[in-house]
């Protein structure tokens, strides 16, 4: 029942010897979602122990090179490894032409299907769902069309208290009703409240990815209450004007979004190459949102399962 984020790259436009460009993998119960795929992603995937062939979904936030130049080598390697299962890619509409060019010129060895889902929404919209999880995309505020993502578990079926089964003499049909979250209404008008006889076994977990973006009013509401938020913090607070000019965020802006959204934890990255060390970012961030961590390449973050 793991829900584990592996951070592969934390650089912004210019990679450094310590930071690869943006790329992450979220493992949701063994189903792998890759988010952005900057240059060198294959090497980082190997270092992180992630199987290329187990990646089912790749989410591309926008068509800037530091977020996707690693994709084409990864697709080619998947072909060399004999991948046969389909790969789902979620990206802005302009990516279709890029993918078509790549496939026409370099795609001979790629025998698996690529399902491209074009992102063009103006508010959060579900773009994928399975029995246990769903993926939502929503617009960011960047220089070009850019999207953030939420990956979250679905609400599990209710469990029925064993004591309630014996006390009420529940039938299989009534147990099924309670597991769907509904009250039981018996002939004659007797009601068995769901809240009395059943319970949610655990709290669904959620993760939001917001990069690249400048702040905007709707964002906090869209990501409200997620367990873990990754938000770009390209610049320290003193470089506010540069952040405005480039449509990025400062440390304080990222922390303010986390605070306003009431998230569980804040994780920041996408650091400017101007700073060999960004340890000083943490002091700025924690003045606004104390439960903040700096992401580093190859860090792992687990969202634990909280049972009720």
Regions found by a protein language model. Name each.
Residues 87, 276-299:
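Short acidic, glycine/proline-enriched helix-loop-strand junctions
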Residues 6, 90, 115-120, 136-138, ...:
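General small-molecule cofactor/ligand-binding pocket signal
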Residues 83-87, 92-120:
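Active-site neighborhood of divalent metal-dependent phosphoester bond hydrolases
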Residues 39-90, 118-120:
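Active-site metal-binding motif and surrounding structural segment of the metallo-beta-lactamase
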Residues 120-268, 279-283, 288, 304-308:
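Metal-dependent phosphodiesterase/nuclease catalytic metal-binding core
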Residues 35-38, 55-63, 92, 207-213, ...:
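Active-site neighborhood of phospho(di)ester-bond hydrolases with catalytic His/Asp-centered motifs
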Residues 71-77, 102, 276-286:
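Metal-dependent catalytic neighborhoods of phosphoester/phosphodiester hydrolases
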Residues 1-48, 84-86, 149-151, 199-210, ...:
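Conserved beta-strand hairpin/beta-sheet module of binuclear metal-dependent hydrolase folds
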């Amino acid at each position: 029942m793991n829900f584990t984020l592996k951070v592969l790259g934390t650089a912004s436009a210019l990679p450094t010897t310590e930071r690869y460009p943006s790329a992450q993998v979220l493992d949701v119960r063994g189903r792998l979602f890759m988010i952005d795929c900057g240059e060198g992603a294959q090497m980082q995937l190997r270092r992180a122990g992630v199987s290329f062939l187990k990646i089912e979904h790749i989410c591309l936030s926008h068509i800037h090179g530091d977020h996707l130049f690693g994709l084409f080598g990864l697709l080619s390697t998947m072909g060399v490894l004999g991948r046969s299962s389909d790969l789902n890619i979620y990206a802005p509409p302009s990516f279709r032409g890029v993918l078509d060019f790549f496939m026409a010129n370099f795609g001979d060895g790629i025998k698996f299907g690529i399902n491209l889902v074009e992102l063009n929404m103006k508010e959060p919209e579900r773009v994928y769902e399975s029995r246990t999880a769903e993926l939502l995309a929503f617009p960011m505020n960047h220089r070009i069309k850019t999207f953030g993502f939420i990956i979250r578990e679905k609400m599990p079926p209710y469990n029925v208290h064993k004591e309630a089964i014996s006390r009420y003499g529940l039938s299989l049909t009534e147990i099924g009703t309670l597991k769907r979250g509904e009250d039981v209404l018996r002939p004659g008008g007797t009601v068995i409240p769901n809240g009395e006889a059943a319970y949610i076994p655990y709290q669904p977990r959620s993760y939001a990815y917001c990069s690249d973006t400048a702040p905007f009013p709707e964002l906090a509401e869209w990501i409200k209450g997620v367990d873990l938020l990754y938000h770009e913090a390209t610049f320290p607070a003193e470089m506010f004007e540069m952040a405005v000019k480039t449509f990025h965020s400062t440390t304080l802006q990222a922390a303010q979004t986390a605070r306003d959204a009431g998230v569980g934890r804040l994780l920041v990255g996408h650091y400017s190459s101007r700073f060999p060390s960004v340890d000083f970012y943490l002091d700025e961030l924690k003045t606004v949102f104390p439960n903040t961590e700096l992401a580093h390449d190859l860090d792992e973050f687990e969202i634990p399962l909280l049972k009720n």
